[in-house]
Every structure is written in C-alpha cells, then in structure tokens.
C-alpha cells in the first residue's frame, strides 16, 4: 500500500510539473503576442499614411481601434492569470513589419501598386497574428484558464473578420485604377 501512495505522490509531482510547464509556456506566448500587438499598433498609423486608397485607409483606422481593444483584452488576461505585464522581443513580427516598410520604399506614392503590396504585407501580418492567437487559445484551453479562453476567442474571431475586411478593402477602387475608369 505504501508503494501506491508513493506512486500517486509521484504522479501528482509529474502532473504539477507538467501544469507548471504549460502555464510557463502560456505566459511566454502571451508576452510574445502582447509585444506583437503593441508593435502592430505603432506601425498601423505609419502604414495608413503610406496608403492612397480611401477604403484601405478606413480599414486601417478600424484595425487601429480594434487593436487597442485587443491590447486591453490581453492586459486583462495578464491580470487574470497573475502574470507580470512585460513586453518581450518578437523578431517574427519585426520581419513582417520590415517587409511592409520595404514595400513603401520601392513603390510610387499613392499608387495601386503600393496599396496592393501593402495589402499583401498586412495579410501576412494578419495570418501570423491569427496563428499566434489560435496557438495561445489552445494553450489557455490546456491550462483550463476559462476567462483567458473567452477573451482569446473574441480576439481570434475579430482577427478573422479583419482578414476578410482587408481582402475587400480597396478592391473596386484599385480595379478602377487598373482598368483606367
């Protein structure tokens, strides 16, 4: 009978260790996503200035507003999980942002070529964010953190909507310019 208790005690230690690992991974991922969202919030106004298409400008304005709400939700998650709020370096988002800057550097001002290039660059950032948020959601589910799960579901849903809005932004205006109408 003593062996059974030792086995159970050992299982709890392994389970606790596994739970600690999952939570630490969730914490690190949360900091990465938070940093990426903060960096994206800084870049959006710059991209908006580089765009010529009114529909795309309006879409970026909406993304900026929604991004602030995402940051607030992430801050609630930090507080709920009792994780210190800090930004971590996120090289992945930096590379994607740099690609948008490169598009601005090599394309003519107020051209559909620049707008189309920026849409592609922004779509890459959107895909990255959706992937990261979905991973974070799965981690929160694995840690049984219900409030975080609910907030992350809202963000993932909004990110998918943003992706759809971006796909439609400026399409007719750019087509008119291409066709010379």
Name the predicted role of every residue range.
Residues 1-181:
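Amphipathic alpha-helical hairpins
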